[in-house]
């Protein structure tokens, strides 16, 4: 991973255009090729980014400014004009063991994989932990029509979970063998804000009854 702290301005050129005026920012260049621009707020969320597969070309323009152009396979560009670099370092992090889910969440995934018809009549499981460039989606399924469906499972469903599934869907829908891919956000509890965001993005919400999945109570589920 490469960490760069620099005064820079950023322009995104593609389906939409966006501009970040000059400011001090953190630039992250990861081993998977992704590039993201961060401010000193917003927790882990970048101001702008380019997901892999993408390619970074560094060049020098007038006034000794550096121009980084990150291009994805669709031809969209993230253009970073660097006025001054304050820090530039690279670090080898090695292979990460990945997120270890708590017992209930991991068991929910296992149970839903075993009873995939809970998602709807005619659903079949393609794979658990289907890997994407930014991590594994919990379940990849096909619905009764044979269309791909990505399922993200949480114990408590909040906005971050919806954002996570949105990123998975963006990547999966770039694969012509899978597209179009729809999403299901499944959790024991789903916060109203998360439900609203999911609905706005065309993601279906499913509230899971853990005890019912284990076969100890009613098998009724609430669909939104």
From Swiss-Prot:
Protein keywords: Cytoplasm, DNA-binding, Endonuclease, Hydrolase, Nuclease
Localization per record: Cytoplasm
Family listed: Belongs to the NucS endonuclease family.
Group of enzyme by EC: hydrolase
Record's protein name: Endonuclease NucS
A molecular-function term among this protein's GO annotations: DNA binding
CDD domains reported in the protein's UniProt record: NucS-like
Gene designation per UniProt: nucS
Function: Cleaves both 3' and 5' ssDNA extremities of branched DNA structures.
GO cellular component: cytoplasm
Enzyme Commission (EC) number: 3.1.-.-
PANTHER family per the UniProt record, alphabetical: ENDONUCLEASE NUCS
């Amino acid at each position: 991973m490469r960490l760069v702290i620099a005064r820079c301005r950023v322009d995104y050129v593609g389906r939409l255009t966006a501009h970040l005026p000059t400011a001090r920012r953190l630039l992250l260049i990861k081993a998977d090729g992704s590039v993201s621009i961060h401010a000193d707020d917003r927790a882990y969320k970048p101001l702008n980014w380019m997901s892999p597969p993408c390619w970074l070309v560094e060049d020098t323009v007038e006034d000794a400014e550096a121009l980084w152009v990150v291009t994805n396979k669709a031809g969209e560009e993230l253009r970073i004009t660097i006025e001054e670099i304050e820090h530039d370092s690279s670090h080898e992090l090695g292979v990460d063991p990945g997120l270890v889910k708590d017992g209930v969440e991991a068991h929910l995934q296992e149970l839903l994989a075993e009873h995939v018809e809970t998602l709807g009549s005619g659903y079949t499981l393609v794979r658990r932990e289907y890997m994407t460039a930014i991590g594994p989606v919990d379940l990849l399924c096909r619905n009764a029509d044979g269309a791909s469906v990505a399922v993200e499972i949480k114990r408590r469903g909040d906005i971050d979970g919806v954002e996570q599934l949105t990123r998975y869907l963006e990547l999966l829908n770039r694969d012509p063998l899978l597209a179009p891919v729809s999403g299901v956000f499944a959790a024991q509890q789903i916060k109203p804000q998360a439900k609203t965001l999911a609905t706005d993005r065309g993601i279906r919400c499913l509230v899971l009854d853990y005890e019912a999945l284990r076969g100890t109570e009613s098998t009724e589920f609430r669909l939104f």
